Curated annotation (Swiss-Prot):
It comes from the Bacteria. It comes from Rickettsia rickettsii (strain Sheila Smith). Its EC number is 3.2.2.-. Pfam families: Pur_DNA_glyco. This is Putative 3-methyladenine DNA glycosylase.
Length: 183
């Protein structure tokens, strides 16, 4: 049985697209629930019109400016929470949106969509600005799972749709069952 430990801050303090692709297959642990990350999107700096920090630093986007390895949680449409992980060097606003996961404990469940995964896991605005490194209840670990993924345009946005910054698992069949994770 593999012991799940948090990834180091250095993992997140890199190019956002590298982090987004390498998060595919990583394990999200949140308050007793374990899930494999299956879909991510990158939002990178003030030159990305879809990035919340495109217009500069605000109270809402302050967390995006770092340090890396913290959660950025916000509400969309007045009803759904979205989970992001802050990336890049401190002072540069960027984050990876977690769009989909495959829950492996306490049950086997595929959740496609950031709102669905936050609702199931119980993630809300109180989980904004959580340190994912020094935390035993909310973190990302690595069990060595490598999943094939496709790169596509981001979805659910109206600006920056030309960026191929969405990463989604292409075939998860029979891969996740190989791993037994103990948080």
């Amino acid at each position: 049985m593999n012991k799940l430990i948090p990834l180091p801050r250095e993992f997140f303090a890199r190019d956002t697209n590298v982090v987004s692709t390498e998060l595919i297959g990583k394990t999200l642990y949140f308050q007793g629930k374990t899930a494999i990350i299956t879909e991510t999107e990158s939002y990178i700096g003030q030159n990305d019109p879809a990035c919340h920090a495109a217009r500069g630093r605000t109270k809402r986007t302050d967390i995006m400016f770092g340090p890396a390895g913290f959660s950025y949680v916000y509400l969309i449409y007045g009803m759904y929470y979205c989970l992001n992980f802050v990336t890049e060097a401190k002072g540069f606003p960027a984050a990876t949106l977690i769009r989909g996961v495959h829950v492996i404990s306490p049950e086997n469940l595929y959740l496609n969509g950031p709102g669905k995964l936050c609702k199931y896991l119980g993630i809300n605005i109180s989980h904004n600005k959580c340190d994912l490194i020094n935390n035993n209840e909310f973190f990302v670990g690595d069990i060595g799972l490598k999943l094939p993924y496709s790169t596509t345009a981001r979805i659910g946005i109206t600006k920056g749709t030309d960026k191929l910054w969405r990463y989604v698992v292409t075939d998860i069949t029979n891969l996740i069952s190989q791993y037994n994770v103990q948080p």
